Amino acid sequence: YVHTFRRPVKFEGTTYKTLTFYWDRLTGADMISIENEMQDMNEYALSPEMSASFLAKMAAKAAGVGSDFIEALPVPDFTKIRNEARSFLVSTGY
């Protein structure tokens, strides 16, 4: 999935017009890593497909960026990416 930002996004000195998400490259280890990261922050996702935090972290892994980048996006871009992450997760039977 290639997300085209509504407006270019600047983050840590880099300007992004698009961001590519490689959902099919995610592994079980990535999912466990996300859960562990959330637990370290005292966050828990009882239903990962409904957790904005879980989905943002999953999207970040799929795009090869930090979750802080995804979380810093404007709401319209964040929401679109979160929904794409949810669609992917549900399509896998998670």
Give the ranges of each region predicted by the language model.
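Short, surface-exposed, charged amphipathic helix/loop patches that serve as local interaction elements
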Residues: Y1-Y94
